[in-house]
């Protein structure tokens, strides 16, 4: 495959893939902090009013540390729904609207978690060297 063809494929991917768009959002710290906390568990859903209330309660503190606008929680959630990060549906058992993360949002949050995780950089040969040195000390 030529460089041009590969570059065009990646360009289309960046434009079309919801997870990649999420990773490029200015609100990614807010998305990763709030949505992972409240909806990050497998199969998690939350009534829309509960997520709005939780996010509104957190926005005051988050604004002290992040460069956030004065937007409401409801406005952020609507933006994230339109961006393909949140799905809003009627819950079967409660007959109220709930939010859930989309598969693309979960994928994007996994990438963020992987990048935040400490990396183990000890190689097998380094471990052997350390064990040999410990054995010689004993």
Briefly describe each language-model feature range.
Residues 38-45:
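Short helix-capping/hinge SLiMs at alpha-helix to coil transitions
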Residues 2-3, 9-12, 35, 74-75, ...:
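Generic structural signal for short, flexible, solvent-exposed coil/loop and linker residues
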Residues 19-23, 43, 72, 100:
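Non-transmembrane, amphipathic alpha-helical segments
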Residues 47-137:
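Extended assembly-interface/linker segments at domain junctions
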Residues 29-37:
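Short, hydrophobic/amphipathic alpha-helical patches that form generic packing surfaces
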Residues 1-30:
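Intrinsically disordered, low-complexity serine/threonine- and proline-rich regulatory segments
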């Amino acid at each position: 495959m030529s460089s041009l063809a590969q570059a065009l494929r990646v360009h289309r991917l960046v434009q079309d893939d919801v997870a990649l768009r999420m990773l490029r959002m200015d609100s990614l710290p807010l998305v990763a902090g709030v949505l992972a906390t409240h909806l990050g568990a497998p199969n998690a859903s939350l009534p829309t009013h509960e997520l709005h209330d939780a996010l509104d309660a957190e926005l005051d503190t988050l604004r002290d540390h992040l460069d956030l606008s004065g937007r409401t929680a409801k406005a952020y959630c609507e933006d994230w729904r339109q961006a393909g990060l949140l799905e809003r549906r009627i819950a079967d058992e409660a007959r109220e609207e709930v939010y859930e993360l989309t598969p693309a949002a979960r994928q994007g949050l996994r990438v963020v978690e992987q990048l935040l995780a400490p990396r183990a950089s000890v190689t097998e040969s380094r471990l052997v060297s350390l064990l040999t040195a410990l054995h010689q000390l004993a």
